[in-house]
Amino acid sequence: MVLLWGTFLLVCTRYLVPISVRYIMSDLRDGNLVEKSKRLVWARFNQYTAGEMRLLETYLSRINPRDPESSRVQFTLAEYKELLGRPEIDVRNVKPQLDHFLGNVVTIEGIKNGAPAWDMYTLFTRATCLYDEDLRQYVISINCNPELRSVFFNLAEDGYIRYRLRYTKNMKSQYSIKLYGMLRDWLHHGAYTVPIERLREELGATEKSYCAFKPFRVRVLDPAVSEINAISDLK
C-alpha cells in the first residue's frame, strides 16, 4: 500500500493485488460465470448491503447477458435467505427486505454532449413471491429495470469483465465485492493511481466516519483487500 499526497497507487496483476422464461437453480453453483458490463462495474451502490450485492452477483450469473428475454430470474426462498445472510427471513417477513432491495438507487456516470453526466436508477423494478407447487417451496422472482436492459445485456458495446461466481458470492463486505470488480477492470492497466476521495465514492463508503483516511483504511480498505486475497483469484 502506497499513499502519495492523498492518492492510492493500485498495482494490479493477475495474481497480485497490493494495496497498503424461468430459471431456478437447485443450488447456488459457485462455478457459474458472471459477465458484468463496465457501466455496472463503475456504478455507485451507496445503499446496497453486502447481501444485496451477493444477490446481484448471483442474478448476473443466471441471466444470459446476450438475451434480454432472460431478465426474469427466480430464487428459492432458501437461496434468497442464504445470499442475504438472513436466516430469520420467511414468507411472512420477506416483503420489507424486498422493498429495500427494489428501492435501492444506483448512480451510473457517463459522458453526454461532451460533458460528464450521470443518471440515477433502481436496477430492479419488480419482485414476485409465490408458492411453487412443483418445488413445494416459495420462490422469489426479480426483473431488472427495462430502462437498464442495455446495462445488463449490451456487453459488446459497453465492454465487460467476467469471472466465476465463487470469487464474490461468499464475500461478507459490499466493499470487497465492489473493489473486486474494479480491480478486475484494472488488471491490464498495471499501476493505477486513484485519488482517495474518488476511491471512497466508487466503493460507496461515503459515511462521515470515513472522511479521515485512517478509519477508511482500517474499516473499509484493509478488510476488503484481505477478503479479496483470501477468497478470490486475485492474490
Predicted regions and their residues:
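Charged, alpha-helix-forming regions
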Residues: 3-235
